[in-house]
Amino acid sequence: MISMKYRDLRDFLSLLEQRGELKRISQPIDPYLEMTEIADRTLRAGGPALLFENPKGYSMPVLCNLFGTAKRVAMGMGQEDVSALRDVGKLLAFLKEPDPPKGFRDLFDKLPKFKQVLNMPTKRLNSAPCQEQVWQGEDVDLSRIPVMHCWPEDAAPLVSWGLTITRGPHKERQNLGIYRQQVLGKNKLIMRWLSHRGGALDYQEWCEAHPGERFPVAVALGADPATILAAVTPVPDTLSEYAFAGLLRGHKTEVVKCLSNDLEVPASAEIVLEGYIEQGDMAPEGPYGDHTGYYNEIDNFPVFTVTHITQRQDAIYHSTYTGRPPDEPAVMGVALNEVFVPILQKQFPEIVDFYLPPEGCSYRLAVVTIKKQYAGHAKRVMMGIWSFLRQFMYTKFVIVCDDDINARDWNDVIWAITTRMDPSRDTVLIENTPIDYLDFASPVSGLGSKMGLDATNKWPAETPREWGRPIKMDEDVRARIDALWDELAIFSDKDAKR
């Protein structure tokens, strides 16, 4: 499966630079708004990753737009092309539910996958680059880091690519998650994690098991791309994100124990924040411009107190912005879409394709095409999408079409909706379900509705009427006109080029 290898973020940046996928910016650029404007224009034009070498007021460079194209997401996952991410999805589908060998020959066919799994354990180091420089106690000062202030009405600078490491009281494996963090002071951040996310669940279980005790937390900034992407990929609960990252990267993930707690962090991370959450210590977070294209409302979240900052020599701060699509999360959604397809097909073999349009804010709308097999089949698929992977818990709209429709072509999808749907019969509405708290359109924060659209051809059990047959030209006629077409010269060369 692996087609390219790299060891850490710096190794990956060297690879990008060799391929013209990284632009160094030497001019002084302000982390307050200016970096966002440059990064946004670059991303919308399909441009390179950006390394701001001289942020105004800081000596630490800032990396933006690392995953600003689907191609770079694929490269981060060890692949040369986005289409190869289907293989990553197939491997994940296998790891979620491995099929037992059906015989001796089948065992040999499956051996490569089993070998990949065996090569995934992490490698623990006694010392690591991420601990080359250490600040602790009164020396901890987050203002040394050029944290971006992305939008004019944002409440404060925002750490956007913080890889947060936690462990529940009853778990051996750690959880890795990406949660945005508002800078609150020289040693304090607000940890914005939603209640269903792994870090929040670990914290909740800790509070129940250890009332009044501090909850250990570590945040890695500038981890290698495979580890970052593993944290946002539907890795099976029985598998460590570190282990899966090793598989993507082509060699084992190297980790090191924190100085102040027992959590293990990526050894090659550029910066690591160590600390704790004091139970009951909450603060209002926001507002912030978000991936929806709007400022979100203010809500209370736990405060993360930083006791240690460790970093590499000449550390790089990895950052991003979020805004109306396309932004980095939307681009990543397009690439990771290819990972989701085989996982869904493993559970629902009737699925032909699955698409999360980037303009749907990464995950809020999904289009599914199926080989329909019975009346009501589309509704079963809708329910399956909403319940199978936690990544789709907040998907508000699911459109199900037949396999003659291209899920990635709005012309096809809209045609199916307008010709194969009766709004009353073919619309499924579900009320009072979990919804993204950032979705201000829902009547209650965190609780809203979902809509399923059955845009499939209807079977006799679904309608008493004779169903329409799509118009299609006679194939012999098409072949004759194909042979005659150039001779007709209906379009001039100028028209053809246009």
From Swiss-Prot:
Homohexamer. Transmembrane segments: none annotated. It comes from the Bacteria. Its main location: membrane. Keywords: Cell membrane, Decarboxylase, Flavoprotein, FMN, Lyase, Manganese, Membrane, Metal-binding, Ubiquinone biosynthesis. The lineage of its organism: Bacteria, Pseudomonadati, Pseudomonadota, Gammaproteobacteria, Enterobacterales. Catalyzes the decarboxylation of 3-octaprenyl-4-hydroxy benzoate to 2-octaprenylphenol, an intermediate step in ubiquinone biosynthesis. Its cofactor is prenylated FMN; Mn(2+). It is a peripheral membrane protein. Mn(2+) binds at residues 175, 241. The active site is at residue 290. Belongs to the UbiD family. Binds 1 prenylated FMN per subunit. The keyword Membrane applies. One of its GO terms (cellular component) is cytoplasm. It is found in: Cell membrane. GO terms for biological process: ubiquinone biosynthetic process. Its EC number is 4.1.1.98. It catalyses: a 4-hydroxy-3-(all-trans-polyprenyl)benzoate + H(+) = a 2-(all-trans-polyprenyl)phenol + CO2. The keyword Membrane applies. Pathway: Cofactor biosynthesis; ubiquinone biosynthesis. It holds the Pfam family UbiD_N. GO terms for molecular function: 3-octaprenyl-4-hydroxybenzoate carboxy-lyase activity; metal ion binding. It comes from Yersinia pestis. Prenylated FMN binds at residues 178-180, 192-194, 197-198. This is 3-octaprenyl-4-hydroxybenzoate carboxy-lyase.
